[in-house]
Each structure stands twice: as C-alpha cells, then as structure tokens.
Amino acid sequence: MSSGLDLELSFSQSLQGLGLSPQVAHLIWLPLPMLLVLTAAMVGVLVTVWLERKISAAVQQRIGPEYAGALGVLQPMADGLKLLVKEDVIPVRADGLLFTLGPVLVLVPVILSWLIVPFGQNLLISNVGIGIFLWISLSSIQPIGLLMSGYASNNKYSLLGGLRAAAQSISYEIPLALAVLAVVMMSNSLSTVDIVAQQNGAGLLSWNVWRQPVGFLIFWICALAECERLPFDLPEAEEELVAGYQTEYAGMKFALFYLGSYINLVLSSLLVAVLYLGGWGFPIPVEWLAGWLGQSVDAPLVQVITGSVGIVMTVLKAYLLVFLAILLRWTTPRVRIDQLLDLGWKFLLPIALGNLLITAALKLAFPVAFGG
C-alpha cells in the first residue's frame, strides 16, 4: 500500500531547504493544521447551505437562490454577513455567562472533531491513534452546551428545547458508539487511518458497509438525530417551541448554532464515508492503477494521483450522504418525542448491542473476513 503524502514532512523539508532549522519549521507548521480545519469546515458549511437551499427549492418546484452570484452561490455568504451585523442581544433576566458559553460549547467540540478525519494516508491533521475514542468524547460535550443555552435563556420554550436536545443526544449517543465499536473490532484499531486502510484490500468489495449493513444504518440514523435533522428536529420544532433552545439568540451567537449544526452534518457524513465507505480508497485497488500507469505503488506520480483523487473520493462520498440528508428533510414527517426516545432506547440500542455481539462471533468464526 502506498504510504501517501506526508504534508508535515514535505512542508518542513521545503522550509529547511530555504535555510530554516527543523525547530523553526515545526513552529511555523503548528498553527497551519487548525487554520486548514477551520477553512475546510467553513467551505463545507457554505457548500452545504447552498445545496440545501437549491435542493429544497427543487423539491418544492421553486428556483431558490439566483441573484447572489452565479446560481446563488454567494447566498450563504450573504446570510453569514447578515448575522454578523445583527445586534447581539442578551435577555434581561438571562444568565449572561452561561448564555454566552452555551453556543461555544456546541461549536468547539464539533470543530475539534475534524482533527481526526483522514483524507489520505497522511492527509489528516492528527493521527492520535485513538481518534474514534476522541470523537465520541468530544461529541458528548455538545449536550451540555445545548442544555446550558436553554436554561440560561430564562425562557420556557428555550428550556424545553434544551431538555429535548440533551435527552435526544444522550439517547442516540449510545447506539451510535456501539455501532462504531463493531467497526473498531473488525479493524483492531481506534485510528481512523487504520480503519480506512483495513478497507483498501479489494477496492469496493472490501468496504465495511457490506460487512456492517446494520451498523451502517444505525450510525446514519443516530447521526441524523445528533445533527437534529428531520425527522429528528424535536429540539427546535417551530410549531411547538418557536425555535427551541435558540429562541432568545440573535446575531453572532445564533450564527454559532447555525454553524455547529451544518459542520456537524458534514462531519457525520465524512465519518460515515471513513468508517463504512472506504474513505479515500478507490473503488479499484491502487495496485491496478499503478500497473496501468507502468509505475510502482510508491512512485511519486502514483502518490500524487492517489492523494488528489483520495480527497475527491472522500468529499464525494460525504456529499452524497449530505444530499440524502437534505432529501430526507422534505420527505419524512417529524416524529413525536415519545417515538423518538422509543426508537433510540427500545429499538436501536438492542439492535446495536446485538450487532456488536454478532460481529464478535463472526470475528472468531471467520477471522480473515472480519479482521481476526
């Protein structure tokens, strides 16, 4: 298997070629990954918001954004600028500190979770070795921010929305974690890079979605619930709770919730692509591509092609799932809160636990096929 492109090593060697010491080159590199994450997340949000507006318009037989740039591509930027210039209001009887801290606790863990998303063998910010555990830990912080925002607003609709959001997130966090553990068990690693590498043996046929179809469905349903997408948008049901925990927010604080929701949707889609759809992997083995080019797998030309196409493959798989999530918004009705909790605790949790046990049994019975 090709070792891929090591961005940090290439960047460091380039700076050392200009006469800088390795220590200085490392210091210059340190802020760049976070800037890259923020840039990728913001671009992902802009593209997703534009897609949602255009797809929603197409479903409703409308045109959608048209005048803000070609095909309305600048409309998301106009929305962001509008929120930036709006007045930042804190209700008189609200808890100012918690009211401000809530949106931050919602957004920051989602952005930090992007650190573990690999776009290639070495095209990721941090291969910590326990990336899946880190992501689950960070995602468990978000309900605290949602509940804090609802409580601090001193508004009954906000409080009910915060309680719903916390209950929903906790209910679906457990089956989601169990579904991921089945994949971890097959790959024998908590590293997202190792999980993708484990799926690159036979191209399309080695993707985890074929060995974990139940886990794939559980993960996707739970991811939609975690992102509060229809049919699971109970925390901000307009007909019942005005805007849920966001009711009293305006301006930049509201924009943080807005960003967090869409960044989380793109992140969830990327993780589905990484865990179940082969990540950056080709539908065909890399060895075949190298053979057609008459090069070795480790040749620079093959590394550049696989690195570039790997990024495209990861993004395409993720946005296919984003497209599906947007379509589901307009084709499924909102469930009731009791149905939401019943689905999580009485249906998805037992199935996820059973899927984990069956995966363990298959791993023992068929170690070659299930990563023994």
UniProtKB/Swiss-Prot annotation:
UniProt KW keywords: Membrane, NAD, NADP, Plastoquinone, Quinone, Thylakoid, Translocase, Transmembrane, Transmembrane helix
Gene Ontology terms: cellular component: plasma membrane-derived thylakoid membrane
Protein name per UniProt: NAD(P)H-quinone oxidoreductase subunit 1
Subunit field text: NDH-1 is composed of at least 11 different subunits.
NCBIfam families per record: PRK06076.1-2, PRK06076.1-5
EC numbers, comma separated: 7.1.1.-
Membrane topology of the entry: Multi-pass membrane protein
Domain of life of the source: Bacteria
GO biological process, one term: aerobic respiration
Biological role stated in the UniProt entry: NDH-1 shuttles electrons from an unknown electron donor, via FMN and iron-sulfur (Fe-S) centers, to quinones in the respiratory and/or the photosynthetic chain. The immediate electron acceptor for the enzyme in this species is believed to be plastoquinone. Couples the redox reaction to proton translocation, and thus conserves the redox energy in a proton gradient.
Coiled coil ranges: none
Family statement drawn from the similarity comment of this UniProt entry: Belongs to the complex I subunit 1 family.
Enzyme class: translocase
Major localisation: membrane
Transmembrane segments: 27-47, 97-117, 128-148, 166-186, 204-224, 266-286, 308-328, 347-367
Annotated GO MF terms: NADH dehydrogenase activity; oxidoreductase activity, acting on NAD(P)H, quinone or similar compound as acceptor; quinone binding
Catalytic reactions of this protein: a plastoquinone + NADH + (n+1) H(+)(in) = a plastoquinol + NAD(+) + n H(+)(out); a plastoquinone + NADPH + (n+1) H(+)(in) = a plastoquinol + NADP(+) + n H(+)(out)
Cell compartment(s), UniProt: Cellular thylakoid membrane
